[in-house]
Amino acid sequence: MKIIQTFFIITLLWLSQGVQAERVKDLAAIAGVRSNQLVGYGLVVGLSGTGDQVTQISYTRQSLRNMLREFGIIMPPGVNLQPKNVAAVSIHAQLPPFAKPGQSIDITVSSLGNAKSLRGGSLLLTPLKGADGRVYAMAQGNLIVGGFGAEGNDGSRVTVNIPSTGRIPNGATVERGVPNPFNNGGPIILNLHAADFTTANRVAAAINSAIGAGTARPLDGASIQVNAPAVPAQRVSFVSLLENLEVDPGEAPAKIVINSRTGTVVIGQHVRVQPAAVSHGRLTVTITANPAISQPPPLSGGQTAVVPRTDIDIQEEGSRMFLFAPGVSLGEIVRAVNQVGAAPGDLVAILEALKQVGALSAELVVL
């Protein structure tokens, strides 16, 4: 018997009554001070028979030929390389701000072909390029792979985690730094992680109170302009003082986030509901499979067979109605839904319906 049910987890996010002060560095970032993405293409060698099947992945064979040619090894025409210990991979990394030549960064290596596992492999020297096509780092090293896989002669296979992706800590050496506008002089722009006019105004006020009037001014709901010293050493000390100032951020807007795939419902504290009456019913579908044996008549020459027989039963619960008074809070919403025996899936449907009729004073985000 198979009962179709929906299991959900409801997570309720309660915000504290008094907003805690946060540091400026936790609320905003300096414009221009950011990491940059690097990417590259290379070969992982030394695999224990778990590499690409080059008969199906032609670019792995071509890459291997090109690499051998770089070392002066020319394969005769008509020779088809069929190694099992080589895999074509992509490499990506984050180049942090202010990275200098000679520093090391972590890299992630992912299989591009049909390699079964990268465990035990070594990445050959690979250039990592930025969006402008220039080489900013060189990567090489032995992979650390968290997953593994095993396969039997009969085709059965067991895989734990993802063996086709690995990491190399400090696997790339920075060869070129990215120009940064931080030391160019002029004002510093603080960009809030979450745009909010109240927070922007409070950050500017906190800076002016600590450093001096006219030092900072909000440009919009996401940016604050701060006058800073032109000398690099003084700018570093100034930003160090700036980012440790504490600010009371503005309260988050009323919002409900629903993940329909996992059943997670997150409801902010300031969610309110206008007067509304809700009636919601549910269906329970029960499917029962009872195979039956079909016997042929005597001397008919037929064969005994198994005949599938499925019974489907649908039960509808009686609809229950409840009334939301003006300004109902988060706790009262959940309490009312629980009292009528509604599941989290029903709560999702109720919230969407309340939003449609204009009774829900909150932003509804469905993931």
From Swiss-Prot:
- The residues forming the signal peptide are 1-21
Q: Where in the cell is it found?
A: Periplasm; Bacterial flagellum basal body
The organism sits in which domain of life?
Bacteria
Q: Which GO terms describe its biological process?
A: bacterial-type flagellum-dependent cell motility
Q: Which InterPro entries match?
A: Flag_FlgI (IPR001782)
Q: How does it assemble?
A: The basal body constitutes a major portion of the flagellar organelle and consists of four rings (L,P,S, and M) mounted on a central rod.
PANTHER family given in the database record: FLAGELLAR P-RING PERIPLASMIC PROTEIN FLGI, FLAGELLAR P-RING PROTEIN
Instruction: Please state what the protein is called.
Output: Flagellar P-ring protein
From what organism does this protein derive? Nitrosococcus oceani (strain ATCC 19707 / BCRC 17464 / JCM 30415 / NCIMB 11848 / C-107)
